[in-house]
Amino acid sequence: MARKKIALIGSGMIGGTLAHLASLKELGDIVLFDIADGIPQGKGLDIAQSGPVEGFNAKLSGASDYAAIEGADVCIVTAGVARKPGMSRDDLLGINLKVMEQVGAGIKKYAPNAFVICITNPLDAMVWALQKFSGLPKNKVVGMAGVLDSARFRLFLAEEFNVSVQDVTAFVLGGHGDTMVPLARYSTVGGVPLTDLVKMGWLTAERLEQIIQRTRDGGAEIVGLLKTGSAYYAPAASAIEMAESYLKDKKRVLPAAAHLSGQYGVDDMYVGVPTIIGAGGIERVIEIELNKEEEAAFQKSVGAVAGLCEACINIAPSLK
């Protein structure tokens, strides 16, 4: 049986980390792509040389020609410009939209059957544009945001309660930005909803709100500390979890920026929602019931994403 092929489009910090994690899990052979020739080849060689030490068998190669991604089963897109301190994800829109146009054309030509995971920011608008530029089926193009945002929420909760991260489930809806909606009612510690833990006196409603706000600011906190770029270990781990669920048909329930066509009252937009990811790509969007407050927060988030999509159309009218 031939090994699966994973194409990593963009070989910066996330791209290199993705290549290492995919190798360690032996998900398939890996092609690192970047327009900066030499970087993907160098990183590929470096990671391949860790194989004898770490005991994995995976072929790694680097390229600066899209022909190298031909026939890829999975494409993970990180190409584009990362945030610097003081920038919002939305500030990257104009530059990264042009990158998505080139990436979309490359995937359309060489890997039209791939499952595509987009990480480039501003995430929800970029994955929407990438799907349109590539023409791939909507269930095969998805954005990585919810797994990462939920992981941040889970970590902060685990630290607050001094419990294992494995016993914390967390739920984040909406766009990957300042308007994301971490849902306390659907997030649990040992199966007990956070709203019940507040009633039990484990934490105050004010403290919970602080943790929710830190989750929203999770990426900016790291950007502020690094000063020269943005997060890469946790984003890469999050995308690998999604890719693995697709490649192994695990049917994991994972939050992702998925294409909505009527669900949650949203049409032709990518927004973070709970999904089932299996061999068919996004096999199902799970619609949960929202109360008035949650619905209002979700619609505010949807509005922010819609504004970004409109800005994309102004730059590239072909997206209409």
UniProtKB/Swiss-Prot annotation:
Coiled-coil ranges from the UniProt annotation: none
An example molecular function term from Gene Ontology annotations: L-lactate dehydrogenase activity
Family classification: Belongs to the LDH/MDH superfamily. MDH type 3 family.
Function: Catalyzes the reversible oxidation of malate to oxaloacetate.
Record-annotated active site: 176
HAMAP family reported for this sequence: Malate_dehydrog_3 (MF_00487)
Keywords: NAD, Oxidoreductase, Tricarboxylic acid cycle
Positions that bind NAD(+): 10-15, 34, 96, 119-121
EC identifiers of the protein: 1.1.1.37
Catalytically driven reaction(s): (S)-malate + NAD(+) = oxaloacetate + NADH + H(+)
Record Pfam families: Ldh_1_C, Ldh_1_N
Gene Ontology biological process: lactate metabolic process; tricarboxylic acid cycle
InterPro entries in UniProt: L-lactate/malate_DH, Lactate/malate_DH_C, Lactate/malate_DH_N, Lactate_DH/Glyco_Ohase_4_C, Malate_DH_type3, NAD(P)-bd_dom_sf
Descriptive protein name: Malate dehydrogenase
Presence of keyword NAD: yes
Binding residues annotated for substrate, in chain numbering: 83, 89, 121, 152
